[in-house]
Amino acid sequence: MVGRYRPSGYVLVSILLIRGSKKRCPDLKKEVKIENLFATPRGLAMSTVAGWDKVKGPVETAYTLPPSCYFSPDIYTSERKRIFSGGWVSFGRAEDLGNAGEYFASTVSDTPLVAVRGDDGEIRVFANTCRHRGMQLLSEGRGCVRQIACPFHGWGYALDGALTATPRMKSSIDFNKSDFGLIQISSAVREGFIFVNLDGAAGSVDDWLSGFSDLHQPWNLEALRTASQREFRVRCNWKLFLEVFNEYYHLKKVHPGTFGSLYRDPDPPEPVTGCFVSQFGEHVKKGSVGVLEKDHNELPLLPGLTGRLSNGTRYSWVYPNLSFAASRDALWMLEVTPIDPTETQVRMRLMFDADVMQSRGFAAKLATYEERMKIGMAEDIVVLEAQQIGVSSQFARQGRFCPELEPSVHAFQEWYAERMSAVS
């Protein structure tokens, strides 16, 4: 979805008129000129933004993030450095790059990158920029190449990034191909997920994911395979999108007729030291929450799940941009890329056991899982886009959490506040 165009300096203000009568009040929307109403002062250090300290501490006493975190261009600029360049960011799945030459091109922090499987079987991530004059080498998306060829002047690169072709460059003095290979980005593959670190200074990915593999071992994440995926845009800040996927508070209100009553209250978040949060919750009834109750067309239990894990779902959020729900029969994965402060690109996958995907009748059953996710996502998007309007108001203030049903959101916001408010 593409956001509606508005001239610079204009914002959409929703005004609700209320008076003491039984008549329904109109919802009036109009465009008004408001100069610099929501701006964070240029050059303001993030450590001085009011409200960070109120986010930190126990969920029972903590406040939510300052509303400006969801729309301020200056905070968004700081996020690009502190959150998306300075940490490990999810960048697709290794299963998409099964053969030599297969690649995935996208952006992180507005930086074009490409992940490619080499002839040696290794996955490497490069800046998607020609070393000649900066041309983007590969268009966003997936494909397969024997070599990476620049569409501008024909420079060519091997799958390991080495410069191999330089037409008409023989007369250049002191020009060595070995000095102009593609710039390699720090990357790692863990549990089938590809992670990248732009500034190369985030430390070990295993420290970032400390405890992640052990906690998710029963689901064998690396062995799961994608059966369905799609991309779409939502007119809300990237944090709002991932927050709603990691809290139970909205379920009965937003999803009353679909799956709002399928979950019991979740366990408290797991005590972890890595940069992620995870909660497990049992299902009210025995069976899948991946299909609507009317379908009764669920797939078999994932191998390795026993006891409580065989009838529940683990919601995990790997900071900053990867979240998934690992359930008894399937995994729903969401990976986000911020477009700007108020628009988000989402890559959504449905993943299953590889053997189950080869079973008879799988395609028909997959359709019921897709329908459930489609309906649920549509219900969420309605409130997310309305939340973006509300949180952008000059009257929006920091709120409070429901300790039992929003602790994962608080955990992320506390982590975010620590990184954003750190003195650099």
Regions found by a protein language model. Name each.
Residues 116, 122, 128, 188, ...:
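C-terminal catalytic domain of Rieske-type non-heme iron oxygenases
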Residues 29-33, 96-200, 206-214:
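Rieske [2Fe-2S] iron-sulfur-binding domain
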Residues 31-56, 368-371:
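General detector of N-terminal leader/presequence modules that precede the first folded domain
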Residues 65-109, 113:
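Non-catalytic accessory segments flanking enzyme active sites
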Residues 16-19:
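Short, low-complexity, charge-dense intrinsically disordered segments
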